[in-house]
Amino acid sequence: RDVERSRGLGDVYKRQNINWAEALESIGAQVVYGVVGLKTHAKMLLVTRREGRQLRRYGHLSTGNYNVRTAKLYTDLSYLTADEETTADMDGVFNHLASQNRPPKLRKLMLAPFHLHRRMIEKIERVGLAASRGEDARIVAKMNALTDEGLMRALILAGQRGARIDLIVRGACMLAPQVPGVTD
């Protein structure tokens, strides 16, 4: 019964999303729906605007949906930027989704399934190395779930090297905190 209820809510949200997409398209916005066979799970908004003789981009990245009802249930992070490298990456992601061409080379963003996993592990390892040199090193990460063995191994090693690690995991988390000799 709960599955039916949640499926029903999902259908309502899908219909609302379609309505919003159609309304945005009717006023000239380009709405990108994603790639068939690839789950698109991004909360990104990119505005490109002409300012004088130049085009300027403004981007919004979020861990949460743009939904008033669910916003009351979750704690999400939001990032608003006009940084040229970040907004260029966002533009590349949208172009990839719209054209289904090869994934773009990104400078600041990471895109699954193409390079997110590898680059996350590299970044965690870099923080661990900094901690082992006595530098102030910290990882703060928010995610829906933490079940990947490679990421967990990298986090454990970084913590053992002295990095301070704060994880905000909404769902399944297979990494137990404060295990003596492992994650203490």
Protein language model annotation of sequence segments:
Residues 77-175:
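Long hydrophobic segments that form regular secondary structure
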Residues 6-7, 31-38, 165-175:
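A generic structural motif
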Residues 11-77:
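Phosphate/diphosphate-binding loops
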Residues 2-13:
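Single conserved hydrophobic/aromatic residue that forms the stacking wall/gate
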Residues 1, 19-27, 150-161:
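Catalytic-core regions built around general acid/base machinery
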